[in-house]
Amino acid sequence: MALALVTAAVGASGCGGDSQPPARAPADSRLLDVARASALTVTPGGGLLAGDLETGAILSSPPRATPLARLKVATGGQRGLLGLAADRRGHVYAAYTRRGDRRIVVDRIAPGAARRIWTGPRSADLANGGHLAIAPDGRLVIGIGDLQEPALIADPRAPNGKLLVLRTDASNRRPAILSSGWNNPFAFDFTPDGRLWVADNSPGRRPERLARGDLGGAPEDVSELMRKTAPSGIAAISSTELAICGFVTETLDRYRLNQGRWRFAGTIARGCRYGVVRISRGRLAFSTGRDIRTVAAR
């Protein structure tokens, strides 16, 4: 998962002198008080679901009397409640590290009783991934990091460093590989034109990438992030504009597609640490580590 990447933080102190356009006015609305909300998704009705990394509680806005669910998560390092997604039928899916063997699993948690969709690999202290998204064709996509075993990225039998497609109506013993070659693809989103863009974490001082992740092979159309960010979330504002949340920078940054490359285009808001999602009326909801706030996308 792309939270608190220890390796990504190495060398990040050199970014303080980067020149950049000033941030916009502070986010002007608080939606929910959720500490370390690492999983965000929007329901078909326009509501927001936010999952707490360490408690496994899933809260909603507009608020419910009780949490939608409280998952039994294993914690420590980058473990916990990792991802949420809601499809057009109103089914809600959660990815998390379960207690006991600490494997990454995906459940359908609503409506009705929870049902296991996929039992994945054992988690690691870092680079688990676990973000979920619904593809335009309705398929469920999960990103899995290298799990601190980068040598397995090249192994087609291992989930390490891959974006996987999970069926929601059948067994997922061998999920289809959407793309491979990632360090930790926790931050990804589909743009309105159907393309999947990934803001990939990278270890140490290696540059972080913003690249296509839906072409069936290695990352394509690769750009580099302007500074060491440790991306923890990405939201498509349009087909040519993205908002990227940075755990290290604690900013919500704008990137625009220009002549085939993504280029930094200023800071939308400060305080973003754990994720971002586009909500209704042209706004973004982002997690500060203390609460969920909103800001205008433009």
Language-model segments: residues:
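Secretory targeting and sorting signals
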Residues: 1-19
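Acidic, Gly/Ser/Thr-rich repeat motifs that build Ca2+-stabilized beta-propeller blades
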Residues: 15-149, 187-189, 194-199, 207, ...
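Beta-propeller blade signature
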Residues: 105-111, 156-168, 212-214
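Acidic/polar, solvent-exposed loop segments in beta-strand-rich repeat domains
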Residues: 148-158
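Loop-centered beta-sheet repeat module
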Residues: 157-166, 173-198
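Active-site rim elements
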Residues: 174-176, 221-225, 238-240
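Predominantly extracellular beta-rich ligand-binding scaffolds that present long acidic/polar faces
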Residues: 197, 204, 213
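Flexible internal linker/loop segments at domain or repeat junctions
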Residues: 216-230
